[in-house]
């Protein structure tokens, strides 16, 4: 039954929170580059980042190592789902 239920996607929850709250992030790529800005959108394969100079960057997720927010992200939706599974 767990397979038919929508699985919690922590990645989507995280990206959506930083997008909605306009939290500045640092994106570390696997080649060592660092990109700073705010998340404007994302899908299954890409993240759109708006840099501090207002340039929009389309980043492929397979090139991302880490995304570090400048402030803690509250995972409000995941707590409700955790309680439902108990």
From Swiss-Prot:
GO MF annotation terms: RNA binding
Domain of life: Bacteria
CDD domains in the record: Hfq (cd01716)
GO BP terms, alphabetized: regulation of DNA-templated transcription; regulation of RNA stability; regulation of translation, ncRNA-mediated
UniProt GO cellular component terms: cytosol
Disulfide topology: none
Stretches assigned to the Sm domain: 12-73
Keyword annotations of the record: RNA-binding, Stress response
Task of the protein: RNA chaperone that binds small regulatory RNA (sRNAs) and mRNAs to facilitate mRNA translational regulation in response to envelope stress, environmental stress and changes in metabolite concentrations. Also binds with high specificity to tRNAs.
Family: Belongs to the Hfq family.
UniProt xrefs under NCBIfam families: Hfq, PRK00395.1
Assembly mode: Homohexamer.
Listed name of the protein: RNA-binding protein Hfq
Species this protein is from: Caldanaerobacter subterraneus subsp. tengcongensis (strain DSM 15242 / JCM 11007 / NBRC 100824 / MB4) (Thermoanaerobacter tengcongensis)
């Amino acid at each position: 039954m767990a397979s038919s239920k929508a699985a919690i996607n922590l990645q989507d929850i995280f990206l959506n929170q930083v997008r909605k709250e306009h939290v500045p992030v640092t994106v570390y790529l696997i080649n060592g580059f660092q990109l700073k800005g705010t998340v404007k959108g994302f899908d299954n394969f890409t993240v759109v980042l708006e840099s501090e100079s207002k340039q929009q960057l389309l980043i492929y997720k397979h090139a991302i190592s880490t995304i570090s927010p400048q402030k803690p992200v509250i995972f409000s939706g995941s707590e409700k789902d955790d309680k439902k599974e108990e």
